[in-house]
Amino acid sequence: MVPIQSKKIRSRASGNSVKLDHKMLQQLAWFRYQLRRFLRFSEKAARAERVTPQQYQLLLGISGYTSRPWATIGELAEFLQERHNAVVGLVERAMKRRLVRKVQGTPDRRFIRVHLTARGEAVLARLAEQHHQEVGHLASRMLAASRTRPKSSGR
């Protein structure tokens, strides 16, 4: 077997030569693979609870992004990395599913607080427990991978 060597490539942006370290690329690829596996797990878990992955993320953002039991549309837009109007639509759809409710602020009635409903809290509790366990498994795999070279799964 021929040992894998580092390669040099020229950066288009700077024109400088950049050394590609194969071990670093393997670690980045392994991290990306594990991240995608976690995201696929999350999507399946959400759908099993009859919510969309985005609705699960919304519930998580309301409950976990701030120290309050509610969040504003702007805070949720930042948490979800979405546009304000996209989050408004997501909140409206979640309201139809009885996952969240909106409360207008006082004295500024334009200020909207988004709260979880009892149903939203129950869905979030079940999904959060599953995700917490999966994060533990992911951390174990990542730690093991940092100590050894990742093996191909043959897929």
Tell me what each language-model feature is:
Residues 30, 37, 57-61, 122:
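Pre-recognition alpha-helix immediately N-terminal to the DNA-recognition helix
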Residues 22, 26, 53, 71-74, ...:
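Residues at secondary-structure transition points
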Residues 13-15, 92-150:
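Charged, amphipathic alpha-helical coiled-coil/dimerization segments
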Residues 40-83:
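N-terminal helix-turn-helix DNA-binding core of bacterial DNA-binding proteins
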Residues 1-49, 97-99, 152-155:
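N-terminal leader segment of winged-helix/HTH proteins
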Residues 73, 91-92:
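Short, hydrophobic-biased segments on the C-terminal half of alpha helices
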